[in-house]
C-alpha cells in the first residue's frame, strides 16, 4: 500500500477545498518505532515533543481550519475562504511533511540506498557522496525554518534537491514528488544540538530509511 500511496501523500492528506464538506478528520499517525529508537542521533525527548506536540498541533489546527473553511463555503463567504488559505497551507503542509518525515527515518537506517534509487542518484548527482553533500548544504542553508527535500520531477524523470520555507509542502508548491525530507525547524534538533544545525544534519544520515525512500521512488516511476 505504501508504494501505491507514496506519490499521492499530499493529495490524500489535503483534499480539494471544494470537497471539505464530506471530509474525514485528519489524525496523528503512529510511529513505527519508539521515541528513543533513533538515539543517539535524535534523542527521545526531541522525538516525543516533535511527534506528540508539534505534529499533533498541525493536525489539530488543520482540522479546526477545515471546519471553519467548511462553514465559510456553506455561507458562500469568499472573503473568509481566502483568509483561511494561509492556515490551510501551513497546517496542511506541516501534517504532510511530518507524515513523510517519520517514515523516512528508521533505527535500522543509514548507509546507502540500493538498486534503482542509487543508480538514479549517481546519474543525477554524480555520486552518492555528492548527493549527500548537496542535500546537506541545501538543508543547512535554509534561512529560519523549513525543509530540505529530495524530490522526483515526473515530467523530466529526474531527481531534484530543493528547499521549502516554513511548512510549505513540496508537491503543492513545486510539483516535485517528495521522496526524502529533512526537517530543519529548530524543534527538530535544538534540544540536542542547540544552534549547531550542521551537527544535526551530519547525524541524521545515520537514521535515514532508504528502504522507504526507495519505495517512494519506485512508486513514482510507475
UniProtKB/Swiss-Prot annotation:
A cellular component annotation (GO) from this entry: mitochondrion
Residues found modified as N6-acetyllysine: 68, 75, 114, 122, 130, 202
Cofactor note: Binds 1 Mn(2+) ion per subunit.
EC numbers for this chain: 1.15.1.1
UniProt keyword list: Acetylation, Manganese, Metal-binding, Mitochondrion, Nitration, Oxidoreductase, Transit peptide, Ubl conjugation
Xref: Pfam families: Sod_Fe_C, Sod_Fe_N
Reported cofactor(s): Mn(2+)
Localization of this protein: Mitochondrion matrix
Maturation and modification: Nitrated under oxidative stress. Nitration coupled with oxidation inhibits the catalytic activity.
Residues modified to N6-succinyllysine: 68, 75, 122, 130
Residues modified to 3'-nitrotyrosine: 58
EC primary class: oxidoreductase
The keyword Mitochondrion is annotated on this UniProt entry: yes
Record-level Gene Ontology MF annotations: manganese ion binding; superoxide dismutase activity
GO biological process, one term: regulation of transcription by RNA polymerase II
Top-rank lineage group of the source organism: Eukaryota
Residues annotated as signal peptide: none
Known function: Destroys superoxide anion radicals which are normally produced within the cells and which are toxic to biological systems.
Protein family: Belongs to the iron/manganese superoxide dismutase family.
Quaternary structure, from the entry: Homotetramer.
Protein's name in the database: Superoxide dismutase [Mn], mitochondrial
